[in-house]
From Swiss-Prot:
Region Disordered, residue ranges: 1-27, 147-170
Catalytic activity: dCTP + H2O = dCMP + diphosphate + H(+)
Keywords of the record: Acetylation, Cytoplasm, Hydrolase, Magnesium, Metal-binding, Mitochondrion, Nucleotide-binding, Nucleus, Phosphoprotein
Protein name: dCTP pyrophosphatase 1
Subcellular location, record wording: Mitochondrion; Nucleus; Cytoplasm, Cytosol
Organism: Homo sapiens
Amino acid sequence: MSVAGGEIRGDTGGEDTAAPGRFSFSPEPTLEDIRRLHAEFAAERDWEQFHQPRNLLLALVGEVGELAELFQWKTDGEPGPQGWSPRERAALQEELSDVLIYLVALAARCRVDLPLAVLSKMDINRRRYPAHLARSSSRKYTELPHGAISEDQAVGPADIPCDSTGQTST
């Protein structure tokens, strides 16, 4: 659980969070808010020097590992996260938050505008996995019947690579 301005945010533990059906995120904080909060946090501790893309990626992978540990050894017969104990739900919320924070920090360091990148990638995915060909199928787009596009046809906007300092290279 996170605390913002003295208010507990996130999983309220109420029935709505465990109810099946539609879920939507809070409108705030935005990804830009998260980027700024993390940048301020790191600056206050003089940690920017350690936040090279490689280090941020390794920290992200470590947090994904901690998230995976929450699911490890659970059986298919056990309830999903909605049925977990409040302690397990709090751990889930913290690890998902850590993953998002490091993902946003890595994207910022590499100068990738995540909201725009997501829109571009979803467009590519729609072309790779047309609903009429991919519905109820777990097959990769290269294995779908004729009509799905190939990888070389699904090229998105030009990437702007970053060097080890996080600066864009030209």
